[in-house]
């Protein structure tokens, strides 16, 4: 999906894990990673105004909220992952968050 895959992509996103540095207080790392992918695919390459990536990122956030009911790490862990009958693992959140992203990218006309 991303051109010229590089291990640097993983390094760039590493600090988002656990709601930013495992603080569990900020945006879910899976959501942050998806927004990074959106930026890589649709973001601007200079300082000129460009709303495409912003529009798609906003749509992604809305879909993430519809799916999980929250975007912040701590409430997600408490109410979606660790609750009895919940997902049980952040890996499952990551998987579902990626599926939400792939569906959205398909709607945007990106061949996957």
Annotate each predicted stretch with a short phrase:
Residues 1-16, 67-75:
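Acidic-glycine-rich active-site phosphate/pyrophosphate-binding loop
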Residues 17-26, 81-86:
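A short glycine/serine-rich beta->alpha loop
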Residues 22-36:
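Conserved phosphate/anionic-ligand binding catalytic regions in large, soluble enzymes, centered on
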Residues 35-38, 81-83:
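Iron-sulfur (Fe-S) cluster-binding segments and ferredoxin-like electron-carrier domains
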Residues 52-112:
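C-terminal binding/interaction regions
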Residues 1-12, 38-56:
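Phosphate-handling active-site elements
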Residues 8-15, 30-33, 59:
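Non-catalytic alpha-helical scaffold/packing segments enriched in small hydrophobic residues
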